[in-house]
Amino acid sequence: MSRFEEKKQLKCSFCGKSQDQVRRLIAGPNVYICDECIELCQEIIQEEFEENVEMDLVDLPKPKEIKDILNGYVIGQEKAKKALAVAVYNHYKRINTDTKTDDVELQKSNIMMLGPTGSGKTLLAQTLAKILNVPFAIADATSLTEAGYVGEDVENILLKLIQAADYDIEKAEKGIIYIDEIDKVARKSENPSITRDVSGEGVQQALLKILEGTVASVPPQGGRKHPHQEFIQIDTTNILFICGGAFDGIEKLIQKRTGKTSMGFGADVKSKVVKDIGGLLKQIQPEDLLKFGLIPEFVGRLPVIVTLDQLDEAALIEILTEPKNALVKQYKKLFEIDGVNVEFEGEALKLIAEKAIERKTGARGLRGIVEGLMMDIMYDVPSRDDIEKVIVTKDTVVNASLPTIILKDVKKDDSEETAS
C-alpha cells in the first residue's frame, strides 16, 4: 500500500477500526464514528435513561395522597382505602429500596380483599394501578384449572399483564394483577380430599409459586404449553397480587368463632344480623379463611386482609352523583353532546339505589338499572332537534316509562310531554 493510500484510509475515531472493517463510517469535523460505536453509545444512553426512570419511581405517592385520589373514584370504604394505600405504598417502597446488602429482608405483601358483590373491589384495584401508572390485569379465578385439565393455566394471568404492558417485561414485572372470585377456588370441604379438585385446591396450589415470586414461563400466544413453543420469562417477585371475593357465608364461620349467635334464645333480630355482616367481616382471621376452604399456604401468601362494607342506600346515591366517573355525570355528558340537558330527580335516584339493594348487585347493578331507564330516550334524542331537557322522575323508575321531555321554544305549560 502506498503512503498516499495509507493517508486516505479512514478510521473510526473511537474504536480505531477502518472503514473496511465496519458497515458504515459517519464523518464529522475531523472525526469519524462507525455504526458499531453508535449502537454502543445508544445502549449506554438507554441504560442511563432507565436508571433515571427507576429513580423517578421512588417518588411514589404517600399513603395519604393515594387515599385522597381513591376518594375521587370510590365512595365510602374508608378503612379499606386506608389499608390498601398503606399496603401498596409499602410494596412499591420495598421494590425501590435496595435491601440486598441489609440484614433485614422486606417480604412481599399481597392483598386479600373481602366484600359483597358491587362493593368496589375491582374499582379499587383498577384505580390503584391508574394512580401508580403501572400495568394492570384482571383475571377470573373461576376460569382457572390445574395444569393439564380443560381451562386456563395460571400462567395466562401473567400473559394478560404482559399484554397490558405492551410486552415490556421489565414494566410488567412491577404491575398489579387482580384475581377476582377467588372464593370460588376454595376446596369443597375443610378436609383434604382423595379425589382431585382441579378447579379448587388444584388452582390454589398452582397459584402459590407466582404469588410468592418465581421466574415463570409464559406461552406468548396464551393457551396450553407445548414443547416446540418459545416462552416469555417473567419474574413475579415484584408483581403485586390482589385477590378479591364475596366469600358468601363466611360471616357464619366468624359468628361461630366469636360466639355470637343468631338462633335460639338471646338471638339477634335477623335484620340486625344482616346489618352487622360488615362488622363481622372486620373481625375476620386467617383461620376463618382456612375453614372456608382456602389452603394454609395460600392464605400465608396473602398477608394483608382488607374488608369492604355492604353499600347502603345513601352510599349508592352518592356513587350515582359524586365520583369523577359517576353515572349521572356520564349521562349528562352524553346528552350534552347532543345539545340536551338531563336532570335526575332526588326521588328517582333514591328508587334506583333501592332497586340495586333489592337485586343484591351493589354499585355494579346501578349501570344496568339506569341503562334500562335511559335506553328508549337515548334512541330518540339524536333524531330530534326540538328537545331542550330530559327529566328522570320517580314515575320513570316506578313505571319504567320514558323520562319527562321539555321541548325548545315552546311555552313551558305546553311543552311537557310525559310518555305513558
UniProtKB/Swiss-Prot annotation:
Ranges of residues in domain ClpX-type ZB: 1-53
Gene3D superfamilies cross-referenced by the UniProt entry: 1.10.8.60, ClpX chaperone, C4-type zinc finger domain, P-loop containing nucleotide triphosphate hydrolases
Keyword tags: ATP-binding, Chaperone, Metal-binding, Nucleotide-binding, Zinc
One Gene Ontology CC term in the entry: HslUV protease complex
List of residues binding Zn(2+): C12, C15, C34, C37
Binding site for ATP: P116, T117, G118, S119, G120, K121, T122, L123
Domain of life: Bacteria
Molecular function as annotated in GO: ATP binding; ATP hydrolysis activity; ATP-dependent protein folding chaperone; protein dimerization activity; unfolded protein binding; zinc ion binding
Single Gene Ontology BP annotation: cell division
Keyword ATP-binding: yes
Family: Belongs to the ClpX chaperone family.
Biological function: ATP-dependent specificity component of the Clp protease. It directs the protease to specific substrates. Can perform chaperone functions in the absence of ClpP.
Quaternary structure and interacting proteins, as annotated: Component of the ClpX-ClpP complex. Forms a hexameric ring that, in the presence of ATP, binds to fourteen ClpP subunits assembled into a disk-like structure with a central cavity, resembling the structure of eukaryotic proteasomes.
Name of the protein in question: ATP-dependent Clp protease ATP-binding subunit ClpX
Gene name in the database record: clpX
